[in-house]
Amino acid sequence: GFLSPSRREVDMAITLSPAASPRLIVEPLTPYQLAHYAAPEHIAQHGAPERVDDLPRFDIVGYVDDLIYAPELHYLDEIRPNLRPRLASSSIRAQRDMIAAGGGIGVLPCFLAEGLTRVLPDQVLIERRFWLSTHREVHGTARLKAARRWIKALCRDAAERLSPLPD
C-alpha cells in the first residue's frame, strides 16, 4: 500500500484526492489535465476515432478496474459509460509505455504525453487536482514549510506542462 501521513508514516503526501483526516492539513496543490493519446504509428495503422462513441471499436489502454485506488482514476466511465480497456495496468507509467509502443489509445496526464498524438482533442479533456497533505503536528515546522514552498514553486514552474490545453 501507500505510506500514510495520518499514521505518521510520512510527514507529507501528494495525493489525487483530499485526505479526510482531522490529523492532516490538506491544501490544493495544482490542477492538471488528462486527455486521450495514441502513438503516431498506431494512428497511421489503425486510424483515430472521430467521436467518443467510436472508442469501443479501438484498443483502449487503461487501469485494471479492481486495482483502481482512487475514484479520480475512474475516468473511462466519465468519457463513455462502460468503456473498458483491452490492455490494462495499475501503473500509469506502464500504460504510457503501452500507448507509446502502439498498444492502443489511452488517457494520460498531459505531462506524460510527450511524443504522442492527442486523440479526440475537441471532445475529451479531463481536469483533476493534486493535493498536499501534512500531519498537523509537523505542518508548521521550518523543514515542512520549506518543502511545501519548494513543491509549490515546482508546480508553478510546471503549470504549462500540467495544464497545457484550453478548456
Question: Model regions: which residues?
Answer:
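C-terminal regulatory
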Residues: 4-7, 19-130, 157-167
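Short amphipathic alpha-helical coupling segments at ligand-binding clamshell hinges
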Residues: 139-153, 158-159
